[in-house]
Design a protein with these regions (language model features):
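Short, flexible active-site loop motifs that bind/organize anionic cofactors or intermediates
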Residues: 9-10, 43, 115
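Generic alpha-helical secondary-structure signal
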Residues: 9, 23, 55-56, 128
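A solvent-exposed, acidic/Ser-Thr-rich amphipathic alpha-helical stretch
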Residues: 26-73
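Short acidic-aromatic low-complexity motifs
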Residues: 1-31
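A beta-strand edge to alpha-helix "cap/lid" segment located at domain peripheries
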Residues: 61-132
Length: 132
């Protein structure tokens, strides 16, 4: 499977965590906005391996109610895929909307995502989690 197909299958299967994780390399590194953990937001940091990505996806499932997720374009070569689009999530504990354009770069090895880095409006993310 080509890198763009792997990334698309990962995205399409996010509703079933185990299926999505079947596209994650055992030595994966997934970066959620920033490499290092931060007190600015509990999503931030680098998540390693399948269990690390499971931890990240569990955080998303607990906190985000996806209302819209659009993929505008995916580009790829033999080992890398780039994608961008937009999403809208309702934050479970605040009820606020987090809406952003997003971009992802990933490297694929042996048909699985080995490196994944996501980019989004982190200011909007942090604001949506603030309790008024």
């Amino acid at each position: 499977m080509k890198p763009d197909q792997v990334l698309l299958q990962y995205f399409h299967n996010l509703v079933d965590m185990d299926k999505a994780l079947s596209y994650v390399h055992k030595d994966a590194a997934f970066i959620a906005a920033f490499e290092k953990e931060s007190d600015r937001h509990h999503f931030y940091g680098t998540y390693y391996g399948i269990e690390g990505v499971r931890t990240l996806l569990s955080k998303f499932q607990k906190d985000l109610y996806t209302q819209e997720f659009e993929i505008n374009k995916v580009l790829a070569d033999e080992t890398t895929a780039l994608a961008w689009g937009r999403f809208k999530h309702r934050i479970q504990h605040t009820g606020k909307i987090f809406e952003s354009y997003w971009a992802v770069v990933c490297d694929v090895e042996d048909g699985k995502i080995k490196y994944f880095r996501g980019f989004e409006d982190t200011g909007a993310l942090e604001a949506a989690f603030l309790i008024d």
